[in-house]
Curated annotation (Swiss-Prot):
One of the protein's GO biological processes: dTTP biosynthetic process
Pathway membership: Pyrimidine metabolism; dTTP biosynthesis
Entry's EC annotation: 2.1.1.45
Localization: Cytoplasm
Protein name (record): Thymidylate synthase
InterPro entries in UniProt: Thymidate_synth/dCMP_Mease, Thymidate_synth/dCMP_Mease_dom, Thymidate_synth/dCMP_Mease_sf, Thymidylate_synthase, Thymidylate_synthase_AS
Catalytic residues identified in the record: C146
Residues binding (6R)-5,10-methylene-5,6,7,8-tetrahydrofolate: H51, D169, A263
Catalytic activity line of the entry: dUMP + (6R)-5,10-methylene-5,6,7,8-tetrahydrofolate = 7,8-dihydrofolate + dTMP
Keywords: Cytoplasm, Methyltransferase, Nucleotide biosynthesis, Transferase
Subunit structure: Homodimer.
Length: 264
């Protein structure tokens, strides 16, 4: 994952000191892009252990269209706890926008179903897009979407995906985002009978929180291991039929986890 280490180094060396919503402070750059060839392995960090269980369950939760953390809690995933209200609700966040984007007539658009149908029908379309950034709903969300907009692209029988992430917490959030969208691309490729292309990750405000600087330096001192391999149950052909048990990570060798506080 040299490309991720390059991002951390770039922000440490070139980042601007900025204030932020949480009051923590950041080193920040604007506009940065990483590219991962998904045929070369699953882009899960090896210079610190990453909690893959949380990544998979969160993605399945998004695909359910859920906006309550009950499913996550039932499966031991706590990454959304800080933002949920007393009943576990988050407002119309990712899953709602992906699966139930509201229409003026009172109906809803299932963007995931529609984009998969469009990939199958017209893979050369330039409209293979899913957006979580609904301006009308942003104020109702406990946390507006950080990974806001993604687009699929098909060439030579390979599926690629580009994500635009408006706000990127490089140390804690970005490793999850890379793995999550790489996995989503693999799932969509399988149900559309396509091979794997690239995951392109475009960052808007890419930042390291000031209370993560020592952790970043520790991680940069570590040598990466070879990337692991993600196996997906080949029998699943419906994007909404995937279950946690359908994913198997092989040959994952990593350095120990590095703890850091979450900025809320």
């Amino acid at each position: 994952m040299k490309v991720y280490h390059d991002l951390m180094r770039h922000v440490l060396e070139q980042g601007h000191k900025k204030e932020d919503r949480t009051g923590t402070g950041t080193l920040s750059v604007f506009g940065y892009q990483m590219r991962f060839d998904l045929s070369e392995g699953f882009p899960l960090l090896t210079t610190k252990k990453v909690h893959l269980k949380s990544i998979i369950h969160e993605l399945l939760w998004f695909l359910q269209g859920s906006t309550n953390i009950a499913y996550l809690k039932e499966n031991g995933v706590t990454i959304w706890d800080e933002w949920a209200d007393a009943e576990g609700n988050l407002g119309p966040v990712y899953g709602y926008q992906w699966r139930n984007w509201p229409k003026p007539d009172g109906g809803h658009i299932d963007q995931i179903s529609e984009v998969i149908a469009a990939i199958k029908r017209n893979p050369d379309s330039r409209r293979l897009i899913v957006s979580a950034w609904n301006v009308a709903d942003v104020d109702k969300m406990k946390l507006p979407p950080c990974h806001a907009f993604f687009q699929f692209y098909v060439a030579d029988g390979k599926l690629s995906c580009q994500l635009y992430q408006r706000s990127a917490d490089i140390f804690l959030g970005v490793p999850f985002n890379i793995a999550s969208y790489a996995l989503l691309t693999m799932m969509v490729a399988q149900v559309c009978d396509l091979k794997l292309g690239d995951f392109v990750h475009t960052l808007g405000d890419a930042h390291i929180y000031l209370n993560h600087l020592e952790q970043v330096k520790e991680q940069l001192s570590r040598e990466p291991y070879p990337l692991p391999v993600m196996r997906i149950n080949p029998e699943v052909k419906d994007i909404f039929a995937f279950r946690f048990e359908d994913f198997t990570l092989e040959n994952y060798q990593s350095h120990p986890a590095i703890k850091a506080p979450v900025a809320v």
